[in-house]
């Protein structure tokens, strides 16, 4: 008698082989996809970052940068030079304060979180090293507001550093306008903002949906708002805003995007002018505005282009659409009143 067993037909064997090949293909192709993604992302692949820790590092970075900024200014060793031209044809200034602050801020963040992408105003030699390190201390002020860790994937993060905001005013010794800033964007949205004033030691920080050490003011003037604007743009803004809101509309001319954002908030313990709306009518770099955008978002405010568009903090360093920032106001109404009159100037040189 022939032994009993299972006999497969040639068709059955063929089907089995095809199924096995299909399984192997999916397993192996998934493996290759993962390896390829890791190759593209380098050290960033698969890492997670705690946003609470990153906030603590960002605050420390802004403070360390501020130490360098203040030291250079007080020693009068600016070594001022032009690093290029602005679109308006003016020299774009750089000082030792910019360079030394940039070095400290960049390396502190990269040494603490090597997997994150950092965009900074001044060039950094990737082979240059700095021993500055984070001590892993999270200040009680942050732990009181943000109780637990907030992990996100490192590849979703873009950090924007401004090592010295208001360089022009810094060179003129108008130091009240000077700030150092750090912003953390997650998938292009500003989530963490830090603005530090080196010459007073004041620091504002916020994390969207989590907490802040600063708040909005108790009231704002929507009928005849006070506008704050760059010192070189006050003439054209004054004309448009007074046509829209009346001759009693006040214009504050000031330096520094960080200073202007703080003017919208409750900064009672520091020398700070107060405004209701911040307008910028030409293009502006994202490291100038990201930190302020994050803080305003965390407090329920808004920062958009002059057309009311949200600003994405990925890709290009430039924001071409001008700027409108407010809090405690009807932002959409402001956009509606001002967009048609000002947006046409967004790419024109400042007067």
UniProtKB/Swiss-Prot annotation:
Pathway membership: Polyol metabolism; myo-inositol biosynthesis; myo-inositol from D-glucose 6-phosphate: step 2/2
Membrane topology according to the record: Single-pass membrane protein
Gene (UniProt): bpnt2
Gene3D superfamilies registered for this protein in UniProt: 3.40.190.80, Fructose-1,6-Bisphosphatase, subunit A, domain 1
Binding site for substrate: 121, 164-167, 288
Subcellular locations according to the entry: Membrane
Residues given in the record as Mg(2+) 1 binding sites: 121, 162, 164
Family: Belongs to the inositol monophosphatase superfamily.
Keyword annotations: Hydrolase, Magnesium, Membrane, Metal-binding, Transmembrane, Transmembrane helix
Main location: membrane
GO molecular function, one term: inositol monophosphate phosphatase activity
Protein origin, superkingdom: Eukaryota
Residues that coordinate or bind Mg(2+) 2: 162, 165, 288
Reported cofactor(s): Mg(2+)
Entry's Gene Ontology BP terms: inositol biosynthetic process; phosphatidylinositol phosphate biosynthetic process
InterPro entries given in the database record: CysQ/Inositol_MonoPase, Inositol_monophosphatase-like, Inositol_monophosphatase_CS
Gene Ontology cellular-component terms listed: endomembrane system; membrane
Catalytic activity annotation: a myo-inositol phosphate + H2O = myo-inositol + phosphate
Enzyme Commission number(s) of this protein: 3.1.3.25
Protein name: Inositol monophosphatase 3
Residues that span the membrane, as ranges: 11-31
């Amino acid at each position: 008698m022939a032994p009993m067993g299972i006999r497969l037909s040639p068709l059955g064997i063929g089907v089995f082989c095809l199924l096995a090949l299909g399984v192997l293909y999916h397993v192996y192709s998934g493996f290759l996809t993962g390896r390829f993604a890791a190759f593209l992302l380098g050290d960033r692949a698969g890492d997670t970052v705690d946003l609470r820790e990153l906030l603590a590092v960002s605050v420390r970075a802004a403070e360390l940068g501020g130490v360098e900024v203040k030291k250079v200014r007080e020693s009068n060793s600016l070594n001022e030079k032009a690093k290029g031209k602005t679109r308006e044809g003016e020299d774009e200034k750089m000082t030792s304060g910019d360079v030394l602050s940039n070095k400290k801020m960049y390396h502190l963040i990269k040494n603490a979180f090597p997997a994150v992408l950092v965009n900074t105003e001044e060039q950094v030699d990737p082979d240059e090293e700095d021993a500055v390190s984070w001590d892993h201390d999270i200040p009680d002020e942050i732990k009181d507001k943000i109780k637990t860790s907030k992990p996100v994937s490192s590849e979703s993060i873009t950090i924007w550093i401004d090592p010295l905001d208001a360089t022009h005013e810094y060179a003129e010794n108008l130091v009240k306008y000077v700030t150092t800033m750090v912003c953390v964007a997650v998938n292009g949205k500003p989530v963490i903002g830090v603005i530090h004033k080196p010459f007073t030691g004041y620091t504002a920080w916020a994390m969207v949906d989590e907490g802040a050490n600063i708040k909005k003011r108790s009231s704002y003037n929507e009928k005849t708002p006070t506008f704050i604007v760059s010192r070189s743009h006050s003439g054209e803004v004054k004309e448009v805003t007074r046509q829209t809101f009346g001759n009693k509309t006040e214009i504050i001319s000031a330096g520094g995007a960080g200073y202007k954002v703080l003017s919208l908030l409750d900064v009672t313990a520091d020398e700070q002018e107060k405004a209701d709306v911040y307008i910028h009518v030409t293009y502006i770099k994202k490291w100038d505005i990201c930190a302020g955008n994050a803080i305003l978002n965390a407090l329920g405010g808004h920062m958009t282009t002059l057309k009311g568009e949200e600003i994405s903090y990925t890709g290009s360093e430039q924001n071409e659409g001008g700027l409108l920032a407010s809090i405690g106001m009807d932002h959409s109404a402001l956009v509606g009143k001002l967009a048609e009159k000002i947006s046409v100037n967004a790419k024109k040189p400042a007067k």
